[in-house]
Amino acid sequence: MDFHAISQRFIDMMRSKNSQNASQPPETYPFYHEVRQMSQHPWMYEDPELQDYALSILPLDKLFQDASELEKEGDGSWGYQDYVIQALLKWFKREFFVWVNQPPCEKCGGETHMTGNGPPNEEEKWNGVRNVELYQCNVCGHNQRFPRYNRIRALLDSRKGRCGEWANCFTFLCRALGSRARWIWNAEDHVWTEVYSNKQQRWVHVDSGEESFDEPLIYEQGWGKKMSYCLGFGIDSVRDVSHRYIRHPENGLPRDRCPESVLQQALHEINIEFRSRLTDSERKALEEEDKREKDELDGYMRPVSQATPTNTDLPARQTGNVEWKEKRGEAGK
């Protein structure tokens, strides 16, 4: 069977899944409840006091100046707010947040190794910590904790972590700067951001850990990552955006957590609930946006040779050590 036939078979399979009906009520599927729970995540970004605190930290003059320079150098395809996000992305990656493989010893600065995991203490629980990694210094033997923070205020102060902390804090900062933003969850243990471009009238991929802007194929073509679900969560728009990131049949993993109709029903219900507080004109504008995005995502369902050429210039993953990336299937092809 040639590659075109394989591609068409994959498309037919996905269309068949999309038309699949659930034989049980949606509430009987754990994934239905998981999706609804994840939809609450972006609401933590809407705290006005927290946004004010973020604005007091951000180098606004520098970001706006850098955005103006990018706009002058650009070809007009992006708007000023898009350039603000690009400036934020550069600053966040290079100056603000720190990637942690193993934390250095807090006592002597030596290298450490992981000894296990432990429960969070009361203060850590309050800061959204569910897991604490335990490390021991290779030099002085000092034992220390590395709590995986989820609460935004704690992240703004600690300024370190891995992809979860990076995406969480960066997505929040996009909201603090006035952009519409989505927190993107991938079932294969990665998260990133999408920001809506008013200029281009579409949602744009942004990965703060990789300093990647509008490169949605970086995962499957750069990292060599295989994926199943990619779901986008915002305060006025939730959507299955998997087709934006999974374009080639060999990179698609089984979508078997629930029937497709159950997932679509969950997303539909969430959108209705989130938009119920909006005006009629605001809801109508979002419905038009939904149609444009559906057309975009459906376009990626065409045979690969027509829809998505392979880009061999996309980089392999930058963050994380080699062993960690290989274990996650993200070390590149």
UniProtKB/Swiss-Prot annotation:
**Compositionally skewed regions (Polar residues) per UniProt:** 305-321
Which parts of this chain are annotated as the region Disordered?
Answer: 281-333
The answer to keyword Hydrolase applying to this record is yes
Gene Ontology cellular component terms for the protein in this record: cytosol; nuclear envelope; nucleus
The species is Schizosaccharomyces pombe (strain 972 / ATCC 24843)
Write the Enzyme Commission number(s) for this entry. Answer: 3.5.1.52
Q: Its biological function? A: Specifically deglycosylates the denatured form of N-linked glycoproteins in the cytoplasm and assists their proteasome-mediated degradation. Cleaves the beta-aspartyl-glucosamine (GlcNAc) of the glycan and the amide side chain of Asn, converting Asn to Asp. Prefers proteins containing high-mannose over those bearing complex type oligosaccharides. Can recognize misfolded proteins in the endoplasmic reticulum that are exported to the cytosol to be destroyed and deglycosylate them, while it has no activity toward native proteins.
What is this protein identified as? Peptide-N(4)-(N-acetyl-beta-glucosaminyl)asparagine amidase
Provide the taxonomic classification. Answer: Eukaryota, Fungi, Dikarya, Ascomycota, Taphrinomycotina
Keywords recorded for this protein, A-Z: Cytoplasm, Hydrolase, Metal-binding, Nucleus, Zinc
